[in-house]
Amino acid sequence: MGHILVKNLRKSYPNRRLGRRGAGDPYDLGGLMHILDIPHLEFQENEMVCLLGPSGCGKSTLLHIIAGFDQQISGQVIIDGQVVTGPSSDHIFVFQHSGLLPWMTVWQNVELGVRQLKDAKARQEKIQEYIDMVDLTTFEQHYPYQLSGGMQRRAELARALVASPDVLIMDEPFNGLDFLTQMKIREEIVNMHELFNKTTLVVTHDVDDALLMGDRIVALGGRPAQVIFNRRLEFSRPRDPQKNKALADLRDELFLMLGVSYAI
């Protein structure tokens, strides 16, 4: 489960700059700004897909549409044969800023993912299992403000996975984290993906994150945003561009495509 098909997707917003752009500009649709134009995009079951692209190109908008938060679109998103008409527990969204409820403890936040489980004993066992899995044992009764940024992100990951979704959607999961914490969370996300085999979509600005994590990399670019790169990575993990020339060449290709002439 977790096959995703995007068909004839177009997304527009009211154009507050109407009259400032030239006639015939494809970005200007007579009072609307054309943001996304994706005729066909497919994510296979159990893939981890990393979405790359410059800031403001529509990556997060695409994730919101796939998650069912934004239905003001033309076209369809189909998950496992069903047209997405709104949010669902089958596809869980992890926001780029902490989505933990501040008045709830770690335990209570994770419990939100299994509210439908009626058996109290089974529910408690499952909550503890996932808290232990993300290395937050002994922090069950802590509130979000008592946790570091990385710990908050792990709690969000536990809450998402405990719900057993078919699709896990993550919008910039490393946002606001220091470099070492980013590396740790990245490793945990990859490990969780390999353990649970969930279709996982991750928005990132970091080419290296995409290369190290993704089974597939999709890049958006242009205005309106279109798919300008879509490739499955046939590299085993762990990956190191410094030791793999093909991976290093792909890294350079992605930097150039995103408008960076060299990698620092």
Set out the residue ranges of the language-model regions.
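A short, proline-enriched helix->beta-strand linker immediately N-terminal to the Walker B motif
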Residues: V162-D166
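Catalytic Walker B motif of ABC-type/P-loop ATPase nucleotide-binding domains
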Residues: L168-D171
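Short coil-to-helix segment of the ABC ATPase nucleotide-binding domain corresponding to the Q-loop/switch region
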Residues: M104-E111
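Helix-to-loop junction immediately C-terminal to a conserved catalytic motif
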Residues: A67
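Conserved ABC ATPase "signature" region
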Residues: K121-F139, N191
